[in-house]
């Protein structure tokens, strides 16, 4: 995480129409961790009556009903709910949303699923004529997924890439090695599969997907080097490392920063660097 906004050509506003096939409904749960709030995504083919919802968000009846009414105003019936990962700000409302819409919930983690189908690497969701490709992006959490929407040259990244700042590697569930691999996987989508736009789980849409992902990779390398140097200088506890390395970050975010530091320390140990 960082207090400096990354490149990526972020839009000025959060919420509303993002691409030809996506509309964002912003949940009313702003905080230092969730930024403006959770982005709930309604995804559909323009000429289809069916829509997919990605990350219904927190258990907030008003928000869940707003998602349903927004879909209806677009002439869409919600047919499926997908989860990028299981954190409560993305998934807590999924059960109630399933009751409101009568839809199954698909996720990588079996504990989050409602219905007969989950999600697996290589799956393609085709509801209402859509093509949503499941992309494994563990690291923020072990169950983190992204969804590649080729028709809009976009990728919905959950918390793997945010629209502002950087994300936490939520140790011990999240692992830095996995996260770096996930960023490289997203980078490959921007280099070889035409992805230009990031539709994040929090914050504004990023119109320069490659620039955003490459910033994340560079930022992670920089933070890792800082942590390694801090250890070499004799700082021995995660809290000491946080105070030294994350001095530029709002102290309200230090508990999350400590999770990332623990993940970085594990990574350095695993690779024999400390």
What role is predicted for each listed range?
Residues 8-72, 146-158, 163:
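Conserved beta-strand hairpin/beta-sheet module of binuclear metal-dependent hydrolase folds
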């Amino acid at each position: 995480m960082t207090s400096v906004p990354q490149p990526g050509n972020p839009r000025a506003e959060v919420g509303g129409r993002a691409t030809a096939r996506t509309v964002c409904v912003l949940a009313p749960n702003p905080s230092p961790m969730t930024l403006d709030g959770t982005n709930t995504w309604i995804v559909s083919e323009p000429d289809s009556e069916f829509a997919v919802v990605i990350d219904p968000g927190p258990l907030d009846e008003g928000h869940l009903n707003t998602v349903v009414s927004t879909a209806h105003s677009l002439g869409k019936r919600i047919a499926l709910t997908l989860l990028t990962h299981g954190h409560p700000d993305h998934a807590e409302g999924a059960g109630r949303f399933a009751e409101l819409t009568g839809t199954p919930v698909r996720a990588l983690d079996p504990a989050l699923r409602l219905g007969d189908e989950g999600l697996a690497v290589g799956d393609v969701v085709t509801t209402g004529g859509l093509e949503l490709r499941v992309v494994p992006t563990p690291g923020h959490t072990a169950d983190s997924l992204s969804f590649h929407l080729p028709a809009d040259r976009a990728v919905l990244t959950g918390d793997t890439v945010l629209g502002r700042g950087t994300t936490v590697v939520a140790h011990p569930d999240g692992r830095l090695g996995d996260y770096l691999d996930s960023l490289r996987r997203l980078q490959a989508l921007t280099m070889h599969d035409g992805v230009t736009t990031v539709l994040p789980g929090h914050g504004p849409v990023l119109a320069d997907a490659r620039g955003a992902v490459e910033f994340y990779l560079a930022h992670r390398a920089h933070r890792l080097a800082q942590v390694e140097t801090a250890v070499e200088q004799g700082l021995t506890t995660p809290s000491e490392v946080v105070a030294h390395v994350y001095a530029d970050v709002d102290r309200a975010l230090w508990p999350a920063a400590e999770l990332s530091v623990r993940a970085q320390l594990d990574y350095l140990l695993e690779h024999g660097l400390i």
